Amino acid sequence: ITYTDCTESGQNLCLCEGSNVCGNGNKCKLGSDGEENQCVTGEGTPKPQSHNDGDFEEIPEEYLQ
């Protein structure tokens, strides 16, 4: 499953699964030592092109809490 964007709840959580899914010109910085991934300003690889409408799902609620 691929998630579209970072949350905007102050956690700055993003999921980096083989590509940058931060959007808005940001790149995904992988967390180390148990830290969360973060979207940071900077050039990243583009989102993968979606061939099906369902390729990008909304972020599940459990990630937004």
From Swiss-Prot:
One of its GO terms (cellular component) is extracellular region. It is found in: Secreted. Keywords: Disulfide bond, Glycoprotein, Protease inhibitor, Secreted, Serine protease inhibitor, Sulfation. Residues 1-3 are annotated as: Interaction with thrombin active site. Residues 33-65 are annotated as: Disordered. It holds the Pfam family Hirudin. Gene3D superfamilies: Thrombin Inhibitor (Hirudin), subunit I. Disulfide bonds join C6-C14, C16-C28, C22-C39. Residues 55-65 have a biased composition (Acidic residues). Its main location: secreted. One of its GO terms (molecular function) is serine-type endopeptidase inhibitor activity. The modification Sulfotyrosine is found at Y63. Glycans are attached at T45. Signal peptide: none annotated. It comes from the Eukaryota. Residues 55-65 are annotated as: Interaction with fibrinogen-binding exosite of thrombin. InterPro entries: Hirudin (IPR024793), Hirudin/antistatin (IPR011061), Prot_inh_hirudin (IPR000429). Hirudin is a potent thrombin-specific protease inhibitor. It forms a stable non-covalent complex with alpha-thrombin, thereby abolishing its ability to cleave fibrinogen. Belongs to the protease inhibitor I14 (hirudin) family. This is Hirudin-2A.
